[in-house]
Amino acid sequence: MNLETIIGLEVHVELKTNSKIFSASPTEFGAEPNTQTSVIDLGYPGVLPTLNKEAVNFAMKAAMALNCEIATETKFDRKNYFYPDNPKAYQISQFDKPIGENGWIEIEVDGKKKRIGITRLHLEEDAGKSTHTADGSLVDYNRQGMPLIEIVSEPDMRTPEEAYAYLEKLKSIIQYTGVSDCKMEEGSLRCDANISLRPVGQEKFGTKAELKNLNSFTYVQKGLEHEQVRQEKELLSGGIIQQETRRYDEATKKTILMRVKEGSDDYRYFPEPDLVELYIDDEWKEAVRASIPELPDARKARYVAELGLPAYDAHVLTLTKEMSDFFEATVADGADAKLTSNWLMGEVLAYLNKQQKELKDVALTPAGLSKMVQLIEKGTISSKIAKKVFNELIEKGGDPEEIVKAKGLVQISDEGTLRKVVTEILDNNEQSIEDFKNGKDRAIGFLVGQIMKATKGQANPPLVNKILLEEINKR
């Protein structure tokens, strides 16, 4: 029996508003527990929620960027459940009239493009955060009432790799709109995954498992990969899949049962009586649409068409808005686009990945990188020397020209000076000359290495090659 994997994702994104969705409480991350809450957030008797218009604008902006149809009439509902981090015993969410529906995004895996549908995007408030210790449980209500959008995908993904690509693309689009920073480590992007298997050709879905507590895109992919194998083994051996909630455990690299779900959750939704229905007219929609900046796909296409970058470069540079904006600013300052791309995709990304940092955390600036790239273009420094300058720029900042002068790194491009060095090297390496003339091309590499060593890496490489061949041919 051949089985097909069905994957759908539910993503919660915290909106970057200055105040909460139904109160004036601040939303700053990392504050002392229970210092950013109010009687409205905690559901004291007699208090009334007031809808944050900016949260609605942000939700509309995200929905439009995800190609959703925007509702003209939308409303809020009470989702009823009891849990210690939910002080009101209900959550204000949206049930049957979400703010956005029928959207899609396009992903690419192994060179193949695929459209993934988005069922709905709705607004809701976040719950508090429980922390369980050996002495008991603690609840921090700072997060209670934070504005969220929940983005529910269609079950269109067939592999864990597609799920990873979907999350990357979704995060990128949301970050470009500016409505959220999407930092999983701070809880501003969270993901639950649903996965089931069915015989190829069967219309009906199999019984799904829900994966929770997935704190990185890599964990989402790994969790789905394991669950895919677990369910396949169970089904092929004649077993039955139960509807379960599971979590991915990195230590064992397995999904672990959290609870068995005997039926669908009944949250007894009913319309929120303290909030009127919301009417979104065309004028409001168009005002929000006009505020949407250039999105990653459009920016990627522009890099290829206008800057002549390879499609791969354009893809990597536009994965995050931070990197793309840095690239744009560097090129706008006069640097060559392809050379800038090479440095960002090479040395810069390697440094950031090794140090586990973001661009905003380092001393390198677009102006600094631009000036360094232009020094390479002019022949003032070689790419090899530039790496020494780069190390200083990214660690301490500064002016590339001043660094070059202070460290004596100016490239030697004087032909007379280099010819003298080349002649001395050849005089001391007659065997290498013979080897080269006898067809051993590696000999030229050895000679170039000796010249670079003699000049402390500061010789102009193209000029060295030219002079070297000229001098060899004279002998």
From Swiss-Prot:
It is an enzyme of class 6 (ligase). Belongs to the GatB/GatE family. GatB subfamily. It comes from the Bacteria. One of its GO terms (molecular function) is ATP binding. InterPro entries: Asn/Gln-tRNA_amidoTrfase_suB/E (IPR017959), Asn/Gln-tRNA_Trfase_suB/E_cat (IPR006075), Asn/Gln_amidotransferase (IPR018027), Asn/Gln_tRNA_amidoTrase-B-like (IPR003789), GatB (IPR004413), GatB_C_1 (IPR042114), GatB_Yqey_C_2 (IPR023168), Gln-tRNA_amidoTrfase_suB_CS (IPR017958). NCBIfam families: gatB, PRK05477.1-1, PRK05477.1-2, PRK05477.1-4. Heterotrimer of A, B and C subunits. Keywords: ATP-binding, Ligase, Nucleotide-binding, Protein biosynthesis. It holds the Pfam family GatB_N. Its EC number is 6.3.5.-. It catalyses: L-glutamyl-tRNA(Gln) + L-glutamine + ATP + H2O = L-glutaminyl-tRNA(Gln) + L-glutamate + ADP + phosphate + H(+); L-aspartyl-tRNA(Asn) + L-glutamine + ATP + H2O = L-asparaginyl-tRNA(Asn) + L-glutamate + ADP + phosphate + 2 H(+). Allows the formation of correctly charged Asn-tRNA(Asn) or Gln-tRNA(Gln) through the transamidation of misacylated Asp-tRNA(Asn) or Glu-tRNA(Gln) in organisms which lack either or both of asparaginyl-tRNA or glutaminyl-tRNA synthetases. The reaction takes place in the presence of glutamine and ATP through an activated phospho-Asp-tRNA(Asn) or phospho-Glu-tRNA(Gln). One of its GO terms (biological process) is glutaminyl-tRNAGln biosynthesis via transamidation. This is Aspartyl/glutamyl-tRNA(Asn/Gln) amidotransferase subunit B. It comes from Bacillus cereus (strain ATCC 14579 / DSM 31 / CCUG 7414 / JCM 2152 / NBRC 15305 / NCIMB 9373 / NCTC 2599 / NRRL B-3711).
